[in-house]
Amino acid sequence: MDKKLIIIDGNSIINRAFYALPDMNNKDGLKTNAIYGFTTMLFKIIDIYKPTHISVAFDRKAPTFRHLEFEEYKAGRKKMPDELRVQFEPLKNLLDKFNINRIEIDGYEADDIIGTVSRVAEEDGFKVFIVTGDKDAIQLASNNITTLITKKGVADVEEYNYDSVLEKYEMTPTQFIDLKGLMGDKSDNIPGVPGIGEKTGIKLIKEFSSVEGIIENIDSLKGSIKKKIEENKELALMSKKIATIIRNVPIEFNLKDLEYGNYDKNSVIEEFKKLGFTSLMSRLIDLDGDSNQNKIKLDFNISKLDNINEFIENVNKKKELILKIVKKEGNILEKNIMYVFLSLDGKNIYYIDESDVTNLKDVFSSNEIKKFGYNLKDDYIALRPYGIKLENLNFDISIAEYLIDSTSTTSYECSDIAMKYLALKIKSREELLGKGVKAKKYNELDFKELSEHISNTINLVKEVRPYMEESLNDMEMKSLFYDVEMPLVEVLGFMEFEGIKVDKYKLSELGIEFKEMIVKLEEDIFEMSGEKFNINSPKQLGNILFEKLKLPIIKKTKTGYSTNAEVLDKLREKHPIIDKISEYRQIVKLNSTYVEGLLNIINPISGRIHSSFNQTITTTGRISSTEPNLQNIPVKLEIGRNIRKVFIADNDCDLVDADYSQVELRVLAQMSQDKNMIDAFVHNEDIHTKTATQVFNVTSNEVTPELRSAAKAVNFGIVYGKSDFGLSEELHIPLKEAKAYIENYFNKYSKIKEFMEKTIEDACINGYVKTMFNRRRYIPELKSNNFMLRNAGKRAAMNAPIQGSAADIIKIAMVNVYKKLEEKNLKSKLILQVHDELIVETVKEELELVKSIVREEMENAVSIDVKLDVDLNVGKSWYETK
């Protein structure tokens, strides 16, 4: 095998990577963009050139002989940004994990180390590849040494060997030093000969071979060139000397020490995890191929479960079961199971088809047997049509990973988890099925391919669970995981399967009403504008508003004028057409999203909507929902509230709606321990009225609805980390006035200010914030050198503990209400959660008991100084409960 050496100019490449890539941080807030860029370049170079040996040369801070020769050498260079400086040691540490040789020496630059090592390697029969962003290294090119100059950041390189230098510059690589001597180098502050550029320099060197040759033949020169050389010949010689790379640096090294490939892959993986380089793990595997001795493989056997009784006996002994259900697409209420894959040890994996599902009913529904898996909510729902309730959902790796890192850019798929924990490449769902209209369904897959994919999942659960448990324990989130998040999986599965009834007739009526309103608004808008146009076209609307009606231009886009909601809000006072356009947009959205949208997803069997509840989407811990997104039904306008009329109770039932009152402010009072705010809640004062008296210096009798509304905006603005500018925009008041509001607020609620400041301070140190229940949210933006991102990070740091704690409380309440309804064997069902609100579809004869249970469990979900308060209402529709 040919001996190939890659030698990298460490300072040059990390510097280029830093400026080429956007700001990046790991979970601890360490800047990582330069390390990431360097590593991707390293992988690319290894992949293309297949080196047997690698070394990285770094500059040292100590002055070199060049500084002694010329004091102004590299003078005027910008100071290295701190954001780059802090990345050098972590990069060197990563190179050590790769067992990649590093060389640095006082008095010499990386260029000189590269020059020396490349010479020694060439003499030893190596093919050498120098990677740098500095064209000075072109002088080192030869038949066996190729200089790779990076371009476009670090993404691409340009190759220079002896022949290509000769072709491009019409000179030899060593003559490139003479060119530098003549034309200088601004980046290194090498003066050269003033007035001599690249074109003239090349011409002179072609004629006289070198700087010395030009000086010896100075009389042959003419005009201004002769004068320039004559006046600056010492400068030219000195510039050449400084530009010359030393090739005999006194360093002791053995080429054997530069061998690449003998490294502990697991150590590299751990370092990637610390740096947050999950995406590079798959490239690490591709880099090494199957030959890497450290490669981890999932190990399993797949077979059909023939002896069900023996399996039941074994699972009852072990009290643990890993499972994954594969189902075909179909109605949520119908039997759609194709296969159930089962394992006791993660290695021996069995499967049954639909015909045997009910034979394992006792295993599935046993509360004594812990169930482990991935996306267990889907498994719970799949079994419900068979009259089976999957009990004791103990460990779901997607939920665990979400708790460990709620800000992950991955979707918590098995493929992402396998890569992170095992550096193992398994197919993602998209890779297995494809995407878009050409995507396959599970029942269209070859059984071998399907079974291997599902078995990978089961084996993965077994392999990563211990690591995840250790992380949850270290992060003090075991209780949150086992007592809240895992019981919640069943609750959400239950709610999803049960759904909420929809009055289809009422919904159609609402659609007719909306369409009539849309037509009327169109007529009004056309009349006000004096012509018909496409209101939904930002371009046409912009032309009407800003060219025809001459309204002030607030913001421009690449294609014209911005007409977004923020712009329209600023134009409200300028023309009556603005309110009409805003109303038109609201009704069009309501009609398309909640009338046409809901009509399309009403289940034909149940007449209900079965929304999907998502547990691993938001960074704060809140539950979200899709198809439809019930969290986003507008409630501020009556027209939006009307949507709630279509959500109704089943026959002989009522909806019991229980909504936490100001839960986030109560959490804020608890976490800050602000006596003023705690007292207000303890004495059942209206907190917004209380805040109005504190902020506006008025008595409670003097608090008008407008002042209370402003105080409410201040209260929640503080919770969401709103700035004085944001508050001024919301309340349409001067910036100075908004600033005074916030200052008054913090003067009266001083402990809240202390709490906010301490939260940000701790977040900057730790890289994350925590809720009352130890849920973490990492905030790398706090370490950003971008002012806007940093401020956004501060707002997130202030808000996440409050909103996250409120989310934890509603989850605890959901679990407790669900359990209590089950314990009492009630027919009433918890069917919906929206923000701080729970809805129970209640059988009439159980109404009083359900009201009592819901209030009791919600108000006592957690024990805190500030009592939780619940607004509880009953109605036939969701609308009637408000």
Language-model features: locations:
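Non-catalytic nucleic-acid-binding/docking modules located in mid-to-C-terminal regions
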Residues: 2, 51-55, 89, 98-100, ...
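Noncatalytic, basic helical substrate-engagement surface that gates or grips nucleic-acid strands
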Residues: 2-131, 135-159, 235-238, 244-252, ...
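Conserved RNase H-like, two-metal-ion catalytic cores of nucleic-acid enzymes
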Residues: 5-6, 10, 16-55, 71-72, ...
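Active-site-proximal helix-loop-helix substrate-binding element of RNase H-like nuclease domains
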Residues: 155-156, 162-180, 297, 335-472, ...
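Conserved "right-hand" nucleotidyltransferase catalytic core of DNA-directed polymerases
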Residues: 232-355, 437-638, 654, 664, ...
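Function-dense linear segments that define catalytic or interfacial modules
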Residues: 341-346, 406-407, 412-435, 453-460, ...
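Conserved catalytic core of nucleic-acid polymerases
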Residues: 440-443, 497, 610, 616-618, ...
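C-terminal polymerase-core module
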Residues: 519-523, 527-579, 747-795, 799, ...
